[in-house]
Amino acid sequence: MQIQALTTQTIIGIIVSIFLILLGIAVFALICWGVFHVFVLWLRYRNRESLSLNSVLLQVTVPRENETKIDAAEQLFASLYALYGTTRFEYFRPQPHLTFEIVGLPGDIRFYVNVPAKYRDFVEKEINGAFPEADILPVNDPAAKQRGGMVIGTEYNIFSDNGKVAFMWMNLKGADYLPIRIYKDLAVDPLSSVTSILGKMMEGEGAAIQILIQPASNHWKKVGRSYIGNVKKNEANPDKASYKADAKELEAVENKLSKYGFNTTIRVVVCAKTQESANAHLSNIKGVFSQFNYMNMFKKRWQFFRGLFMTDFIYRYFPMIRGTSVLTSEELASIYHFPNKSIITPGIHWLNAKRSAAPSNLATSGLYLGRSTYRGLARPIYIERDDRRRHMYIIGKTGTGKTEFLKSMIIQDIMNGEGVAVIDPHGDLVEDILQVIPPKRAEDVILFDPSDYERPMGFNIMEADTEQQKHFAANSLIGLMYKLFDPNKTGIVGPRFEHAVRNAMLTVMYEKGSTLIEVMRVLTDQTYVQELLPKVEDPIIRRYWTDQIAQTSDFHKSEVLDYITSKFGRFVTNKMIRNIIGQSESSFSFRKVMDEQKILLINLSKGTIGEENSNFLGLVLVPKLLVAAMSRQDMPMSERKDFFFYVDEFQNFATPDFAQILSEARKYRLNLIVANQFIGQMEEEIKNAIFGNVGTVASFRVGVTDANYLSHEFQPIFNEHDLINVDKYNCFARTLVGGEPVQPFSLDTTKDIAKEKAMENPRVAELVKELSRLKFGKAVAGVEAEIQRRSNL
């Protein structure tokens, strides 16, 4: 009995020992398994902070009128499955993940995609492949400064001071292989409900929906196929058949299994002024996802550690252990896609106007115009000297960036030592240019400022060296009178007016140093006419006075001549204008300005000298510059230096002479750059000359009427909608390369304001002004004395 008891105890002891050994082995194995998985998790995610910081947030914007269907988003997600890695050590490396986000702020709903920097190009190409009209801008590109690029903006911020936060994360309630309701089974675009909720954010509120996706392995498909197999097997056996899933549901499961799958988690964060408001918004967003309820549905999961959740949200961390469900490309497209014209929610940030890449054969040097930014690629745009000789026309509403564009080109020309003339009817452009004049070019500056009453510069309209120039001056003044007093050719200025003015001007020009003052005298002083007639060599002009005027009755003579003098009188009696046009010798020669590559800045500010005086001076200055250019006929083409003539609001100074500049000035190396606000400001002749001869057209934002006209210039790339909605400081350009036209493209003219400010030197500007007025102006007392002596006032 003792032996038997001993044997039983021994056996029990052995069994216990074996059990303890096995338990120890199991515990050890479990510990090893746990340690191994902890090690794997550490190995996978040890660098997730640096990976997060090295990601790029892309803002994706599409045109309001786009008709892209949701299928395009499904195509996009399917293509992103190519990121799935199948290397030998894939278990130890996390699959790359992307974050698709919708952000709602007061009156502003935007769409973003966060992508690891190394996959940025691939993702951008796939987005553009699915949504060709989409515009993609980096928001927080960490490599932007390293590449010498420009950071577009800062990352969005839904949080506010003293705001209350509500948050949640969601995944599927059921098995991964069970589908949710997809967009094909919904009557309306599911995105409409999402944007409607986000569009209700008030001041101090904000919400963000993050959808994090990561390519999934096929394990979920194996489980799903096993489920289908079991269901079909059971239904084939009448004793086991339960008919839990009908044929349509099984078809839906099979459809899901045929698609690419992504491990997915959805995070939602709301900030509001009160906790009640934040909770209400969060509940509304959660409710929106109920539209996808089918065989599966989204379930809100509890997050007990707020700090950890917010860290995951801000860094866009993918869940390390649990918290994901598998959604297919079709299901993801149902939840997230870019809006089209069917979404009418107010506040969506639409792409105002599409972009188009610049042609590859554009110049790589010359005058810098701006950047062409298209599909993530930015390149500088230049125009060569020979193509600039075909002139440039710039159009756009006020405040769209025209003047800044002009200023950028003018400054470059000045820095490059070019000859430049600028007519500015506002004054700000000239003042800005003076601030950046390099000291080495201070001597080249001629500042023509009519508002300088103390030292007026002389500008003699009547100066002419040849018979051709005399007739051109007469025609220019007659054109000026039509522009000012009879723009519609109603007869206010007619043939009799032209005939009298032309003969009066040609008569006084036989007396060297004559001015418009003398024209007034010859029209009113018969004694003065008799003094001049012996000097008049042209018999036709002489007979005008001896025959035609002499035989006209005093009544009709005074009627015609008084009418003419009344038109000229308003300028001659204006002391400021009289002290300028009444000087017998001009303060500077336009020909020398061009040949010696001077900087002529003409400040015709309407605010200081009046609109009528501004227009008058501009209308007499422009023809003089043309005469100077045409006088270059006496020098070989190779010796004619380029001179760049900039005119802002040029319609105020556009006479038929402008059409001649456009058609003939190129051969004289007078290159015109003009800007105005709308086409209707131009006369038909000028408009035809502009669009018939100008080589480069840059259109900033315009009105409906102009968009209709200009759309023909930019077809088929841009349409009326684009021209009406182009962003500020952006334009559409049509230009030449080697004299040949190229397709239109979008141009971003924004510049480094800080760099430009650093160039400004107010002290140099003041010195340049003073130097110019002392060098070219005359003391007002001497000017008035000379005019009084010559006019017998």
Predicted regions and their residues:
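C-terminal anchoring/interaction modules
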Residues: 741-744, 753-793
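Short hydrophobic alpha-helical runs that function as membrane-insertion/retention elements
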Residues: 134-138, 393, 419-423, 444-448, ...
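Conserved ATP-driven motor cores of ASCE-family P-loop NTPases powering translocation/secretion/packaging/pilus
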Residues: 288-295, 321-327, 435-437, 451, ...
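Switch/connector loops and helix/strand junctions flanking conserved nucleotide-binding motifs
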Residues: 144-161, 165-169, 219-222, 278, ...
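Extended, folded cores of ATP/NTP-driven motor/assembly subunits in large transport
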Residues: 3-358, 453-456, 534-536, 548
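Conserved nucleotide-binding/hydrolysis micro-motifs of P-loop NTPases
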Residues: 65-67, 120, 143, 216-218, ...
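P-loop NTPase motor domains
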Residues: 371-377, 385-387, 392, 397-398, ...
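N-terminal pre-Walker A segment at the start of P-loop NTPase domains
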Residues: 361-380
